[in-house]
UniProtKB/Swiss-Prot annotation:
M.capsulatus has two forms of methane monooxygenase, a soluble and a membrane-bound type. The soluble type consists of four components (A to D): protein A, comprising three chains, in an alpha-2, beta-2, gamma-2 configuration, is a nonheme iron protein containing an unusual mu-hydroxo bridge structure at its active site and interacts with both oxygen and methane. Fe cation 1 binds at residues 114, 144, 147. It catalyses: methane + NADH + O2 + H(+) = methanol + NAD(+) + H2O; methane + NADPH + O2 + H(+) = methanol + NADP(+) + H2O. Its EC number is 1.14.13.25. Fe cation 2 binds at residues 209, 243, 246. Its cofactor is Fe cation. Binds 2 iron ions. The active site is at 151. This is Methane monooxygenase component A alpha chain. The lineage of its organism: Bacteria, Pseudomonadati, Pseudomonadota, Gammaproteobacteria, Methylococcales.
Length: 527
């Protein structure tokens, strides 16, 4: 039987390039490259407007054996600590209740990002032409599989060994109720796997990992430790050990297209869009989770953001890519303004919509209010007084018949959803830089909170057609939606979400039903 072309090529290459007698990993890596050949045509299923060079190198030069050995050691350390020492020390119940709720969101939402990163890096493997570059992407595919399991394990560990397991144990089902879910899908799903393959690399590797890994995965371990959580640092620092290779993959993606004429034409616009897509969600959500989802504070979110995003990434990291024509995103200045107030604006809305969550929220106490005012002068007059009014009206007590969403309606502060980012905003109450912009397309009204998202939508309106929470549930009563989407604890009547983290005065489905709260689409006022 005649040999296939591929088999013959491999046989001839092996005959010409004998296997190394050494077990040195770098020598083996060099030997493996001799099996490469030039493609007449790139047969990828995933189109890109850029041409990725065929000679691009991989910085870390991993081979499968070395990769497996390295990751096995890390997993032994991680799971050994979790299943032995931390369990014996009853670490799960020593976590502050507010932080326990924060991890319901962080670990579950990050799991979605890691899961989609599997597909994203697999797509890049298929699109790349250089064998070394493919090898780097393939190692990242394996990393992302590992990280998906790790994030899921954090929820599992808290559900089994921690306090208040509701939300940890079924977050994949209950997370879809509230407005934070679709915004998360926009950055962690659509941004990573939809559209041009190189654009996906910019979203995932150059922005998501190189820019936001430090303020997310590294910073979260500091906040976790400060609030009694030893589980999260054990897992997330293990995840972080892989991230440098992922950043290098993003760097090499840019290197591979540097000489392509399309790079000069499209790259900086695509990078700006990727950065704004990621920061529009991460900047307010991470700041909200860290500062409002903790009892013991580390440092103001704005300082963390400035250090890692503005200075380290926007200045140093992007500066290193300057020789390839890469420029800092034009939207970086506006993002810096968002870092100061946007997370405070978002928490007002998150607390107002607390029944739609899969986690418990809590109003800032007096000590926390003083911390906010000291680090964000003017915070109390704008936000603190509102929280005090809500507390005085009994927002934590189900017998009060009051949820803060009613306050927004009473005071004519409509809540909108940004069509591109899917992040809620209230322009009449925002202290950050949110301005209401409205467009009509195909008979549907679309709202936007900033010029950058508006520009992306105007360029590709068909790309942003996802229904928001008010469109999806318009005309439906709130308790009906909560029950349908499994927002109840195991007793079948008590809500998973609560407006406090205590064990008493828990809201039930009947309490919500008595409010007769019906979803309305605020854009109907423009018709």
């Amino acid at each position: 039987m005649a040999l296939s072309t591929a088999t013959k090529a491999a046989t001839d290459a092996l005959a010409a390039n004998r296997a190394p007698t050494s077990v040195n990993a770098q020598e083996v890596h060099r030997w493996l490259q001799s099996f490469n050949w030039d493609f007449k045509n790139n047969r990828t299923k995933y189109a890109t407007k850029y041409k990725m060079a065929n000679e691009t190198k991989e910085q870390f030069k991993l081979i499968a054996k070395e990769y497996a050995r390295m990751e096995a050691v890390k997993d032994e350390r991680q799971f050994g600590s979790l299943q032995d020492a931390l369990t014996r020390l009853n670490a799960g119940v020593r976590v502050h209740p507010k932080w326990n709720e924060t991890m319901k969101v962080v670990s579950n939402f990050l799991e979605v990002g890691e899961y989609n990163a599997i597909a994203a890096t697999g797509m890049l493997w298929d699109s790349a032409q250089a064998a070394e570059q493919k090898n780097g992407y393939l190692a990242q595919v394996l990393d992302e599989i590992r990280h998906t399991h790790q994030c899921a394990y954090v929820n599992y560990y808290f559900a089994k060994n921690g306090q208040d397991p509701a939300g940890h144990n079924d977050a994949r089902r209950t997370r879809t109720i509230g407005p934070l879910w679709k915004g998360m899908k926009r950055v962690f799903s659509d941004g990573f796997i939809s559209g041009d393959a190189v654009e996906c690399s910019l979203n995932l590797q150059l922005v998501g990992e190189a820019c936001f890994t430090n303020p997310l995965i590294v910073a979260v371990t500091e906040w976790a430790a400060a609030n009694g959580d030893e589980i999260t640092p054990t897992v997330f620092l293990s995840i972080e050990t892989d991230e440098l290779r992922h950043m290098a993959n993003g760097y090499q993606t840019v290197v591979s297209i540097a000489n392509d004429p399309a790079s000069a034409k499209y790259l900086n616009t695509d990078l700006n869009n990727a950065f704004w897509t990621q920061q529009k969600y991460f900047t307010p959500v991470l700041g909200m989770l860290f500062e409002y989802g903790s009892k013991f504070k580390v440092e103001p979110w704005v300082k963390t953001w400035n250090r890692w995003v503005y200075e380290d990434w926007g200045g140093i990291w992007i500066g290193r890519l300057g020789k390839y024509g890469v420029e800092s995103p034009r939207s970086l200045k506006d993002a810096k303004q968002d870092a100061y107030w946007a997370h405070h604006d978002l928490y007002l809305l998150a607390y107002a919509l607390w029944p739609t969550g899969f986690f418990r929220l809590a109003l800032p106490d007096q000590e926390e209010m003083e911390w906010f005012e000291a680090n964000y002068p003017g915070w109390y007059d704008h936000y603190g007084k509102i929280y005090e009014e809500w507390r005085a009206r009994g927002c934590e007590d189900p017998s009060s018949g009051f949820i803060p969403l009613m306050w927004f309606i009473e005071n004519n502060h409509p809540i909108y959803i940004d069509r591109v980012s899917q992040v809620p905003f209230c322009p009449s109450l925002a202290k950050g830089a949110s301005t209401l912009r409205v467009h009509e397309y195909n008979g549907q009204m679309h709202t936007f909170s900033d010029q950058w998202g508006e520009r992306m939508w105007l360029a590709e309106p068909e790309r942003y057609e996802c229904q928001n929470i008010f469109e999806q549930y318009e005309g439906r009563e709130l308790s009906e939606v909560i029950a349908e989407l499994h927002g109840l604890r195991s007793d079948g009547k008590t809500l998973i979400a609560q407006p406090h983290v205590r064990g008493d005065k828990l809201w039930t489905l009947d309490d919500i039903k008595r409010l007769n709260c019906v979803f309305k689409n605020p854009v109907k006022a423009f018709n």
